[in-house]
Amino acid sequence: MKPYVFTLWSLFFAIPMSAQDQADSTATNWERQLELKEVVVMASRTVVKQAPDRIIYLTKNDQYAKGMNGIEVLDRIPRVSVVNDMVTVAGKSSVKYIIDGHLMEISDEAMALRLKNLQASGIEKIEVLTTPPAKYGANNNVAYISITSKNESLGTRGNIWTNGIIRESFCYQLGGNVSHTTRKVELSADASWNDSKGINDLDRTYIFPYYTKISQRTTNYRNRTFGANGLFKYKFTNRLNAGVILNYYTNRLNSKLFDVTTDRGNVYSSTNYSPSRPDNALTITAFSDWMLDTKGKMLSLTYNYYDKQAQSFSDVTTSANNTDTKLTNTGDNKYHIHSAKLDAILPLKLFKMEAGLAFTCIGNNTALDVLYLENNSWMSDTKQSNAFEYDESTAVAYVSAERNFTNSFFGKLGLRYESTRTKGYQRVKDEESRYSYNHLFPTVNLSWNSHKAGRFTLSYSIGITRPNFNDLNPYKYYTTTSDYVSGNPDLRPSVAHNAEINYSFKGMYAVLYNSYNNDAIGYITRFNNYGSQYTIPENHINSNKTGLYLSYYRSFFGWWNINLGGEFFHTYAKSKLTDYKDADDSSWSGKIEFNTSFILNKQKNLILDMRFSHYFPYHERMIRYKAMSLLGCYLRYNLLNDRLTLTASVTDPFGWNTTKSTAIYNDYKVYTRNDIHASSVSFRISYNFGRDKVNNVYRDTKERESKRAN
């Protein structure tokens, strides 16, 4: 049977958010209305539907998603793109994930592995939230992707899988998950392992008025990661439950960098060896939910503790004119976050209201020791060795109200207040800095729907981007003895205004968006008088991006599906620094994407996917990027009543996935070419076991801040 041709919408702004209320897997009143009023029925199942504040993708209803893992499924959602296991949302600067209510605070690589640990057969729905309500943190321009497991009956189910990847070296991944639900207890656990090897080439050409400097750099690395998650939830009564969530992640990265730099006739050969050091993170969440009555009044109390400890070491050697210069960096980074949140849901007669309070306390202690070799003895560099302490506390209060004024018109208003205090202290230099700021963050969401004309949605919000801990850290991390990266403890948060108009009707989806950032953080590369160079973040950019994204989804003949998409946008940036040749920079650009799927046999268990994307040249924050194309092909074979899936894939067969850019400063130009060696062939086997219908194990940890520690 042909699948639904559906209507979609999406919103624009991205403030940090979790998935939905605990009982969100049960359709609310407006969801039931949408099923009747917003879906053009062409067959028996809806694949995508829209709500006033999110896109909802029903994975279980998409026959072309059969046998996919979590990261592959995301590429089937309008406005969402997947490149090299990295997920982006059109008009957004970053993406955060919630899996069964658990906000995932791990590295991008570990998150990709976590998504691969999920199978389409075990996913109930995926929601894309781009204008989260006031109850969630006001982080700027972040899209939230919420994945909810199936919610159908009691029992046990699980999945195991393994994946082999052939590049220059062989890599492998494996994982598994299991969940069990009774009338009183919900349990879930999963674990994943990744052992990857790769090559990263970075070539830079600096053109000065009277000479040219060329740097050719290759990094060979091996990265091993392990992640485990567990949840225990107990239902005391039908209205009261409590539980705990544990998340553990560890990473071991081993790398060796080779750099050859030619500068005014001199040739410098450098190596940077970084053996693996512990990088561990632990998150503990305790929660309780109390349903006060049968009308939906609820109180939720959540406590989060996050602890991360990361050690680093690098041995750097630069050789020139038969002379070696050696130094070592030894780093010890510790982060801890405590947060408590009280949320209330109050469905009143005229509108539904949400209100709450929250408090977060963050601590970051970092130590760096720099040694240099002199006369065959290692000496401490007291000018660069340091210890940095950073503390941050934020108090929050919010309120929001929403109402369906008619069957066609929906409105939602929210207001969030955040008061933040920060303190930074460099112990060696005995320097202390304090900073405080208070902000109000409004959100507005208006939506009108017509069965004949489609849905229109207008949204506006204000968000804030806080510096991450690495950017605040003032230490110098050397890649060669004359090239280092440093943080900046004087960085300040930047505020952004975001607006969006969405339209969807019968498989067509469009969004016109605008985002303005004031005093945003950008990275500047400068040269010292003696030829060394350094890169440092500074607040210096005002930027604006206006774009139009279009997509069209259609199925033909019951065995062929296409998803066409394109984006057209204008970017503008202005720097207040004098480093750049032109203080203003603007450009028009866009991208096109084409995804198609074929069912190749009558049993509908052999599926071929092909994906192509082309990015036109564009400018972003004073950097000019050249065009790039991406191509991938995937073949899936489902056996044993869809319990066993065999997948073969080819990614970037022609080596198109190479980033090229140009930055023009007052004193020089720099041309950069970065090749991550993305070409690969992979084979994956996955097996589902247990009952086909099992309750989801769902809980929002409401933890938002630990992403800044990554």
What spans do the regions from the language model cover?
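Face-selective signature of the C-terminal outer-membrane beta-barrel domain
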Residues: 227-251, 275-426, 447-457, 507-512, ...
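Short strand-turn segments of transmembrane beta-barrel domains in outer membranes
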Residues: 60-61, 154-178, 674
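Flexible loop and strand-edge segments within Gram-negative outer membrane beta-barrel domains
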Residues: 21, 171, 195-227, 233-235, ...
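Outer-membrane beta-barrel signature, preferentially recognizing the C-terminal barrel domain
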Residues: 281, 388-390, 464-512, 516-518, ...
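Extracytoplasmic beta-strand/coil segments of soluble accessory domains associated
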Residues: 48, 71-106
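N-terminal periplasmic accessory domains that precede
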Residues: 38, 70-73, 112-113, 127-128, ...
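Short acidic/polar hinge/loop motifs at secondary-structure boundaries
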Residues: 70, 76, 103-130, 176
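Short, acidic, small-residue-rich periplasmic hinge/interaction motif at the N-terminus
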Residues: 21-61, 82-84, 90-94, 130-132
